[in-house]
């Protein structure tokens, strides 16, 4: 009998959004529910994020806690006091103990402080996750990420403090890139798992669709994802193609999938107006599952202009749908994406624009870059969620 997996997902994305950590957590539960007993603990106001993304016969034991009525990110002490006794009640109800793994879906305080407080009481094997280490202010400024400096100093200090607590009582850690292993003490050797995410292969259209879209971007709308600078790049792309006067791509269109804070979305749309490219962009907001893969299948090129990342599952989704991907050459992604991509120097908008233009206008370049049928088969086998979950399941058995 395999050890039970308890998933604590108080920091799960709310319905209508889906962060990478939440996607990994939901798919982990879906894929492992048939292999070991899975208990999923989350706030009741986030229940739909789970149930809308797993089949009705998922086999997951769900425990929905009363939601914290305030803003949990702004009230860490109150939120922790709210969730800790409620988590304790569930752990007592299910007789949690030393044979159980307790995995946390985020490194937010609501997913760290309650299990840290309760770990000695119940003795469970704690598996925190850190899916992205916050860059220190010098990296932020030197690399031109344009993240708010003061805000990100606070984020960095906040994460470092919680990381210290995690290291004190954790059995192991889950990260999303092997390059992060160097951040951990040697005593965690063999106790780190790089969960790179996956792709819902079954949601990809089985037959080719007409390519009625030119370029597609999909991500949370946030400065980290590079969408701000890409609007400038998109203007260069539109101008370059217009100058070529090509009949097949005379009026290129950009499809943007994703949402963000209302203020940032307004900023981006206002910028598109100022740049004179608003009529070339379709803003679709949050789209997920089959509808998202249909949009991919209708598109010719996927762009991944993220400025700070260590995984980027949307690029894998696009590649598994057969699209070529243009991305910045980030060190953390060099070993993750080696097929079907054109990589350009970081921050070089002209090079990024030239790569997209070449794929849209040069059939030979497109054919040489897009995944071949054999590569597509290999990509899908590598990235399907079931493969990722099986690797994680085997790792659990070694702890």
Predicted regions and their residues:
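N-terminal subdomain of nucleotide-sugar transferases
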Residues: 1-53
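Donor nucleotide-sugar binding/catalytic pocket of nucleotide-sugar-dependent glycosyltransferases
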Residues: 151-205
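Conserved donor-binding/catalytic core segment of Leloir-type glycosyltransferases
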Residues: 208-225, 231-236, 255
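Glycosyltransferase donor-sugar binding loop
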Residues: 218, 251-267, 285
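Short hydrophobic beta-strand element within catalytic cores of glycosyltransferases
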Residues: 324-327
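Conserved acidic donor-binding segment of nucleotide-sugar-dependent glycosyltransferases
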Residues: 341-350, 358-364
């Amino acid at each position: 009998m395999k050890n039970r997996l308890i998933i604590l997902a108080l920091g799960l994305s709310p319905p209508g959004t889906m962060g990478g950590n939440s996607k990994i957590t939901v798919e982990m539960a879906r894929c492992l529910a048939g292999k070991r007993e899975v208990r999923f603990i989350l706030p009741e106001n986030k229940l739909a994020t789970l149930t809308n993304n797993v089949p009705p016969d998922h086999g997951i034991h769900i425990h929905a806690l009363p939601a914290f009525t305030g803003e949990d990110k702004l009230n860490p002490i109150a939120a922790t006091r709210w969730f800790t006794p409620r988590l304790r009640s569930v752990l007592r109800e299910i007789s949690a103990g030393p044979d159980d793994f307790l995995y946390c879906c985020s490194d937010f305080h609501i997913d760290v402080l309650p299990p840290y407080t309760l770990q000695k009481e119940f003795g469970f094997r704690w598996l925190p996750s850190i899916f992205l280490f916050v860059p220190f202010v010098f990296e932020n400024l030197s690399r031109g990420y344009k993240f708010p400096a003061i805000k990100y100093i606070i984020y960095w200090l906040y994460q470092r403090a919680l990381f210290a607590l995690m290291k004190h009582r954790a059995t192991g850690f889950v990260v999303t890139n092997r390059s992060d292993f160097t951040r951990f003490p040697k005593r965690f050797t063999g106790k780190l798992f790089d969960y790179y995410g996956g792709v819902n292969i079954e949601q990809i259209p089985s037959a080719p669709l007409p390519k009625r879209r030119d370029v597609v971007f999909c991500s949370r709308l946030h400065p980290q994802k590079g969408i701000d600078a890409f609007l400038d790049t998109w203007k260069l792309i539109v101008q370059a193609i217009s100058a070529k006067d090509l009949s097949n791509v005379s009026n290129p269109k950009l499809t943007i999938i994703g949402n963000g804070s209302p203020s940032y979305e307004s900023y981006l749309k206002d910028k598109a107006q100022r740049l004179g490219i608003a009529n070339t962009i379709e803003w679709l907001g949050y789209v997920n599952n089959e509808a998202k893969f249909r949009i991919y299948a209708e598109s010719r090129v996927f762009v991944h202009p993220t400025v700070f990342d260590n995984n980027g599952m949307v690029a894998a989704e696009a590649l598994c749908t057969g699209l070529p991907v243009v991305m910045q050459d980030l060190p953390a992604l060099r070993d993750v994406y080696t097929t079907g991509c054109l990589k350009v120097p970081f921050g070089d908008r002209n090079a990024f624009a030239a790569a997209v233009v070449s794929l849209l206008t040069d059939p030979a370049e497109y054919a040489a870059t897009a995944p071949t049928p054999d590569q597509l088969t290999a990509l899908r086998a590598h990235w399907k969620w079931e493969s990722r979950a099986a690797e994680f399941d085997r790792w659990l058995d070694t702890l």
